[in-house]
From Swiss-Prot:
Belongs to the cytochrome P450 family. Residues 32-75, 245-335 are lumenal. It comes from Bos taurus. Heme binds at residue 479. Its main location: endoplasmic reticulum. This is Thromboxane-A synthase. The gene is TBXAS1. It is found in: Endoplasmic reticulum membrane.
Amino acid sequence: MEVLGLFRLEVSGPMVTVALSVVFLALLKWYSTSAFSRLEKLGIRHPKPSPFIGNLAFFRQGFWESHMELRKQYGPLSGYYLGRLMFIVISEPDMIEQVLVEKFSNFTNRMATGLEPKPVADSVLFLRDKRWEEVRSVLTVAFSPEKLSEMTPLISRACDVLLAHLERHAQSGEAFDIQRTYCCYTTDVVASVAFGTEVNSQEAPEHPFVEHCRRFFASSIPKPLLVLLLSFPSIMVPLARILPNKNRDELNGFFNKLIRNVIALRDQQAAEERRRDFLQMVQDVRHSAATVGVEKFDIVRQVFSATKCPANPPRRHSPRPLSKPLSVDEVVGQAFIFLIAGYEIVTNTLSFATYLLATNPECQEKLLEEVDCFSKEHLAPEYCSLQEGLPYLDMVIKETLRMYPPAFRFTRVAAQDCEVLGQRIPAGAVLETAVGALHYDPEHWPNPENFNPERFTAEAQQRRRPYTYLPFGAGPRSCLGVRLGLLELKLTLLHILRKFRFEACPETQVPLQLESKSALGPKNGVYIRIVSR
């Protein structure tokens, strides 16, 4: 105050308030854009970000369309900001190979928001570093073809219920939204295979499991809260974790209790009495010493055997034994991920495949001929016969996943500073693979808008450039459930096409409008007619 007195200044309360307000506003203005110079420093092109929210408005139509626009405007390497978080988007095969395979040790972890609730955070999707490797190792054993073959009868039983519902639609002759029917079906499969519970969600929509699944997928973050989370993550994320959330807590509590009760019941049963489902497969390996090394984690490459091995395959690792058995929370977490993937991804892929077959009758006729020939030799299909005896069905599913990959974006986080093909990548950077932009690149896929299963003949796959087809990711952290997902898709379409054919009708939306808030799916359902054969 004495110093101020030399200049004959009097400091009043309002003046201090104004001064502090000016300082606060200046700091707020600086904060609103301070994170938005990083991409430019890296030499990565990107849309102009807005204060606080970054490029959030750029994605108002969904990530699918925006990824396509990023590729069109900025090429196979671009970036964007969601709030203060920087994303580097890649859709160039050589760079994808470096990130997912060659430099995997530096890009082991997926991005986590910090908002994942406890059961989901304990899943193999979000576990990190050493614990991820341990859990992935034992789960890779659990997802072996031998184990999956034991689950085929459970899926077939759910198919029988589905066929009964489709028969009613065939008799009516009216158009209907088959996506809604598939939603009920996949709910039944998830309940049976992952949660050890038999439901018929079409006939009993009020069943607690069905109702909680519906609430689980209907829940979302309100837009105002999303803006705050993105703009002030260091404050809002910890706050959101501790604030009460009745809906979240009720959902987590229901599924947690359900699985724990099933586990307790199974522990009292003799081994031969236990139901052979996904939950039991995970239970079997909880204390298992049977593990595999990281080089065995890439199940996707094993399934799509035509994919070439990398020039420099990952060095062999000794299997990492479990430092501690899988906790019950981790078992619950795996069932949660099965719910997310088994419901949304399988439902949408079945819907897209149905749409493509209905609007491409010549392809459907070819597939029906194959189904009829297969059915003469295999009345009750088994896992191995499904993999080997239906090559055209396999091609149809692969082309469906090229055109409409449900999991069309996935992330990896750089653990340390590095260079990828000359591009500097700082530690902590999130790299996002734009699968849709890759799958619609005419350099790799001529006439990409056309449905053409012949792209996936054995000869065509051998000629294709590696890392241009990524519906399930690639590398050691690729989709663990790819075998189970393909099994469900093949078995379901086989059962349906034995009895019915799909037909487009005036209500069929051509082309389909898409939504891509999380997984890629039809925006307005898939309306078709189904006809008995």
